[in-house]
Amino acid sequence: MAFPEYSPAASAATFADLQIHPRVLRAIGDVGYESPTAIQAATIPALMAGSDVVGLAQTGTGKTAAFAIPMLSKIDITSKVPQALVLVPTRELALQVAEAFGRYGAYLSQLNVLPIYGGSSYAVQLAGLRRGAQVVVGTPGRMIDHLERATLDLSRVDFLVLDEADEMLTMGFADDVERILSETPEYKQVALFSATMPPAIRKLSAKYLHDPFEVTCKAKTAVAENISQSYIQVARKMDALTRVLEVEPFEAMIVFVRTKQATEEIAEKLRARGFSAAAISGDVPQAQRERTITALRDGDIDILVATDVAARGLDVERISHVLNYDIPHDTESYVHRIGRTGRAGRSGAALIFVSPRELHLLKAIEKATRQTLTEAQLPTVEDVNTQRVAKFADSITNALGGPGIELFRRLVEEYEREHDVPMADIAAALAVQCRGGEAFLMAPDPPLSRRNRDQRRDRPQRPKRRPDLTTYRVAVGKRHKIGPGAIVGAIANEGGLHRSDFGQIRIGPDFSLVELPAKLPRATLKKLAQTRISGVLIDLRPYRPPDAARRHNGGKPRRKHVG
């Protein structure tokens, strides 16, 4: 079908022009939003006017605010039944969207927003539903579970959003989405957002949306070319941060974290390690925030530990580095963060600490910014110790030309004559005294095992089976038109797993094999056994190869096969 195009030609210059709820307007001002993005300027008026909307938008365009702001402006917060339903493909996105609703609705005192996703306690979700939630954000699989348990009532839903619809269909949730839509009232306002518009999405839109406006908005590469971007895979973040600060030359740095509590905790640890650091968050009074920013600008402090909200609008030219201690869950925050460096035409550097389980977030940032992040290596112990020795030598050189040297030279010479101790020993003792008993050099990392040292470069590396994984059987295969993405999506959402928890996946004609953590909790196994993909019960269970079964029964082994 052909969609009418919504033109943003007369789009508002500010959020105040969009006639949104005054309390919502106040909240987005607190968040730091000043003017709407292209998709917000086009979508918010259409949704406020009651139209259905199809948004062709990638991550990083501001689409969450584009649908959350008008929904919050129109719901009845005195009614505790679900009025707004948002369907998303992953638990991470469910949490992200729910948090956004909470921020934009901060001044709607009776507002309750409930995220529903696999891997989370049913008891917590049931309590939230009994308490009453006007906004429910969730993944299709867990939504279906609640519908079948009759614990989720969608009969009074006025607003429905399908976010990242193409991802949901790719992950095999098409039937679940249709089932959920069938439980909602016929007359409701629907918004569908998708990065692409394949035939399946067009068909879904034609079936459930009425004369929708189509808004097309591509994410801009809002990252300046003068900012270098890289990431480091780390296990112990505080140790990694210390190494980077000791080795990387920087003028001033912002360290971004997710929580207010983390700002002060990390700043305190940095001060204890000899760095000039301060913290700002949304809880810091404005006067104190201004004093801290002035100290950063004047060079009285060099490291600022901050949350996203606290750093909005920060413009200090001497910030040469931005370090994402906690990787942001949305690309808008990432682009804003690294925009704090590279000001006034200066070059800047942005670094992300990432764990293996967070690599999918890294890929989302690359996709949205259309820039490849380079992997950097964590400074080694040798790198750190080389810098410490060099700085120690510099401190001696600086002290030799400083005031008061004559007095201490006389005292040291007297000590040398009276105790007959070499001058070098006296200097070493004074250096130890200055350290306060603290080790000067960083202890070496434990040596790599022989197995890790043996790279076997004389032949191609084959994928090695991870010892922490075991093979499970799922009762869906090629004849069910199921791909690896659908299996990963369903199991990750319902089992509370991350993509890094998966090993090899082999699709057979009638069933498939998937490698998962060997020590899955019994409750998780039970839940996954009842999970459905495209309506088919996957009946997940540990896999026992036919040859192993025959050997166990005294028979001859047979060739291993799948499906």
UniProtKB/Swiss-Prot annotation:
It is an enzyme of class 3 (hydrolase). GO terms for molecular function: ATP binding; ATP hydrolysis activity; RNA helicase activity; RNA strand annealing activity. Its EC number is 3.6.4.13. Residues 226-385 form the Helicase C-terminal domain. Residues 551-563 have a biased composition (Basic residues). It catalyses: ATP + H2O = ADP + phosphate + H(+). Residues 44-215 form the Helicase ATP-binding domain. SMART domains: DEXDc (SM00487), HELICc (SM00490). A motif (DEAD box) lies at residues 163-166. GO terms for biological process: cellular response to cold; response to cold; ribosomal large subunit assembly; RNA catabolic process. Residues 451-461 have a biased composition (Basic and acidic residues). It is found in: Cytoplasm. Keywords: ATP-binding, Cytoplasm, Helicase, Hydrolase, Nucleotide-binding, RNA-binding, Stress response. Disulfide bonds: none annotated. One of its GO terms (cellular component) is peptidoglycan-based cell wall. A motif (Q motif) lies at residues 13-41. CDD domains: DEADc, SF2_C_DEAD. DEAD-box RNA helicase involved in various cellular processes at low temperature, including ribosome biogenesis, mRNA degradation and translation initiation. This is ATP-dependent RNA helicase DeaD.
